[in-house]
Amino acid sequence: MLFRSENPASFAESNPYLTVDTSLFPAAFQTALLAALSNDHDLDEATDGLLIHSDNFQALNLLQARYRGQVKCIYIDPPYNTGGDGFVYKDNYQHSSWASLISNTVPLAHYLQPDNGIFFASIDDDEQVLLRQITELTYGKQNFINNVIWQKKFSPSNDAKWLSDNHDFIITFTKNKEIWRPDLLPRSDKATASYKNHDNDPRGAWTSGDLSVKTYSVVNDYPITTPTGNIIYPPAGACWRVSKEKFEEMVADNRIYFSKNGAGVPRIKRFLSEVKDGVTPLTLWTYEEVGHNQEAKKEMVACFNVGQEVSTELLSKATPKPIRLLNRILMIGAKANDSLILDYFAGSGSTAHAVINLNREDDGKRKYILVEQGEYFDTVLKPRVQKVVYAENWKDGKPQADKESSLHGVPQIVKVLKLESYEDTLNNLVLKDNGDLFAKLNDGAKEDYLLRYMLADQSRDSLLNTDVFRRPFNYQMDIATNSAGATERMDIDLVETFNYLLG
């Protein structure tokens, strides 16, 4: 807030990451600001985030030409079809309706990805099988990666009628499994601590691995004599991992460990200095590693002065995902710091929050596209993005500085698009007046007239009225409001629309 005693210039200088919402300013200011920014940058390339207020099917269609083959990582958290969600995409769909919601959008999202693109989708037991089947139709069964299990709760539900539901799934597909590989995760302190130098090996700390494997080979089934003279055979039905000749080479190179007394089962020494710079992701993610539902709720609520900025009722219906969970997904699928991430069931904006935080952490330039259709867009998603750009940490809707009085803001340009609905388009069709011709037709003729003539001929000028391009910045449409049957005359940006359609 700018107090009357403050100079606007000094306030701006001391708050360099405070967002300016250009929609709140006159058109002349918007034009001047965008022109100034365009002088130094390609504004489209400099844009960090794109927030689209729209039905996801319409939004994905709009993105096709501009972003085809560019989205490295897709994460969606669609409705779980359980009856517990009160948002615009209502849970408790009939299976067929829910399947249509998903199947209409997955192919469009698939077109936006390169061959090494990765697709993640959160889901629970109710629709996990159906979601995988639908996604397979587009990505192909051969490109299924894994079903990740996420431990979403930190305590059991003792009042559960049957079993305590403590996990969700994250279904994972890639566009081409032959070329996609997961980015390695940072090695944790706990994992690093497991490496010890028990024998003062000059190569440094090491841990030991099993020398036996279950894929049996006669060549690798041989007895091993320990330094103390014990004879060791592979476990029943197994064999050693290496041939006898290779084993003897490893013994000579001090890469086999027989325990401190030299009498134990041989194990392979794996040196910390030789392992990959990171660890391969597992398919079981615990809440200690990636957070839980309550953590996610607290992260979202902390951004708002609940009861004033946003209602308690609205936030109580939210089902956000924890930032640590999304960070894990980004580290696997979008570690490259110029990746583009898409979430077309954006909800409260957790995906954008995670991308902004990761960029803040590693100075990355990742970009994000979020799509959400309900009032949640204006009340939660957009304000949340504005806030996490300005400051890393929040409490009760107030930014929290660190010990050095830094808010850790980041520079961002975020574009906000609002698309008219299909219903709005139909409501703005202007038909030729043919008097009482329609009233004189019988029912069969009326239907034939509607399908074969009226939409094709009488509404032709509405479908692409070239006259509006004489003044493209003044084009308007009647857009439905929250009141039943009410509309409001609003400006439509034809130039921006055609830029997206043309790519």
Q: Which residues make up each language-model segment?
A:
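Conserved beta-strand signature within the Rossmann-like core of class I S-adenosyl-L-methionine
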Residues: 117-121
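Conserved SAM-binding loop and adjacent beta-strand
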Residues: 313-324
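Small/polar loops that bind or transfer phosphate-bearing groups
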Residues: 52, 122-123, 343, 372
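A conserved hydrophobic secondary-structure block that centers on an alpha-helix together
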Residues: 41-66, 74, 85, 104, ...
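Mobile active-site "lid"/loop adjacent to the S-adenosyl-L-methionine
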Residues: 72, 79-101, 114-116
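Accessory, often C-terminal, charged low-complexity segments
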Residues: 1-30, 43, 48, 64-68, ...
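Short, glycine/acidic-enriched loop or turn micro-motifs at the edges of active sites
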Residues: 58, 80, 127, 346, ...
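Conserved proline-anchored active-site loop of SAM-dependent methyltransferases
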Residues: 69-84, 135, 341-355, 498
